[in-house]
Amino acid sequence: MQLNSTEIAELIKQRIAQFDVKSEARNEGTIVSVSDGIIRIHGLADAMQGEMIELPGNRFALALNLERDSVGAVIMGSYDGLSEGMKVKGTGRILEVPVGRGLLGRVLNTLGQPIDGKGPVENDGFSPIEVIAPGVIERKSVDQPVQTGLKAIDAMIPIGRGQRELIIGDRQVGKTAIAIDTIINQKDSGIKCVYVAIGQKASTIANVVRKLEEHGALANTIVVVASASEAAALQYLAPYAGCSMGEYFRDRGEDALIIYDDLSKQAVAYRQISLLLRRPPGREAYPGDVFYLHSRLLERAARVNAEYVEKFTNGAVKGQTGSLTALPIIETQAGDVSAFVPTNVISITDGQIFLTSQLFNSGIRPAVDPGISVSRVGGAAQTKIVKKLSGGIRTALAQYRELAAFAQFSSDLDEATRKQLDHGVKVTELMKQKQYSPMSVAQQSLVLFAAEKGYLSDVELNKIVDFEAALLSYANTQHAELMAEINAKADYNDAIVGKLTALLDDFKATQTW
């Protein structure tokens, strides 16, 4: 068989048409040095700030310092086996984490990988860990409450959906306890929770997860863990990863709550990374951008309007606002709130719950100091009945603390002062609450009403706790309809006042405490 020149030309053209060569441009570099979790790379000319760099052994580093001749990157995880001269690749991707409802009930690491042994995580996609916060026009004012279930906080330092409320205090004063109680109280509220553990002992985190599971709150919670044994880079990135997971719900017209436990350890991890990268240190050896470290994180907690949600979901969700409420925790040293990181976070947040060792050690738990604790926007979100009843409580406690200071120097006090002191002591006792026992709005309202209307005046101080327990038990069994009505509407009117008065009069007549 002979082929003429035309057929040969056609065959060659067909072969050329079928020949597929794909050119692949790779951004490669060489490791120049490895030390203390930091690598310096030569040759990654197109690297971006925050880009993931692929290392040998399916590991990644994060590009943080872009210099003229080299790139400084922090290794996310172990750096065993890495040595000078190894090749690395730029991925062209910013760090992303999985997001979605499938993450609820799971314990994850900073990169969104499961560490609870329950198999792979189902996700609805991925989200960058660094996201620009919603703008001014996209926000809505805070006017709906987040019930912590702790009467001292819900009455005196109320928290609203979309607020940033700092929990601050020394070590071992109950900061995490407040956060965990708040999560437990959300299991039936529809608010999804994210708990970010930064730089904590693995045993402490395991205990928190176990308590959430025991109280049925884990199914509504995502736990993100960067324990004390993990690399500084993972501790630094964990809050941003958790925030992206919480934003998934906010941007779809739902409510979410995120707890950062704690941001002091994140700041220390960031300081360690910055010093190793040879960035110039500032006050307390922190880098110059440590304020921005926390401000860009906490500004992402917001209440967004219906237009923002509709635009984000491409019209799938209409007429619904979304919120992400943040409860950052800061640990102080010997009560020093004027240190660098505490003052930064106080100025960023919308108020603070200040816990003191003195109150904690004297048995007042939660150890909230009402004198310097404040909620700047939560008052607008407080339920009507609790707002009406709590005004007198805060005043009574403030007057009591003022009078108690003077009473130490004077033995003969007039009757009015004695009554105020007696009332203040009893209200302080009434504000105590056991851990893992959150109270409903109706239960809080009943207890506050009893204090406000003088029903504690003839109750001995050592009987206050028993009085409260017996009162709540009586109300739940004999007046269940009234309690359900208050929980549903939370109104304060003459009819409710009449019913509460009748309930307390009937209870006082039983003398069952």
UniProtKB/Swiss-Prot annotation:
What molecular functions are annotated in GO for this chain?
A: ADP binding; ATP binding; proton-transporting ATP synthase activity, rotational mechanism
EC id: 7.1.2.2
User: What reaction does this enzyme carry out catalytically?
Assistant: ATP + H2O + 4 H(+)(in) = ADP + phosphate + 5 H(+)(out)
Gene3D superfamilies documented for this protein: 2.40.30.20, ATP synthase alpha/beta chain, C-terminal domain, P-loop containing nucleotide triphosphate hydrolases
**Site feature: Required for activity:** 373
Q: Where on this chain does ATP bind?
A: 169-176
Q: Which InterPro entries match?
A: ATP_synth_asu-like_sf, ATP_synth_asu_C, ATP_synth_asu_C_sf, ATP_synth_F1_a_nt-bd_dom, ATP_synth_F1_asu, ATPase_a/bsu_AS, ATPase_F1/V1/A1_a/bsu_N, ATPase_F1/V1/A1_a/bsu_N_sf
Family to which the UniProt record says this protein belongs: Belongs to the ATPase alpha/beta chains family.
Kindly provide the name given to this protein in its UniProt entry.
ATP synthase subunit alpha
The organism named in the record is Aeromonas salmonicida (strain A449)
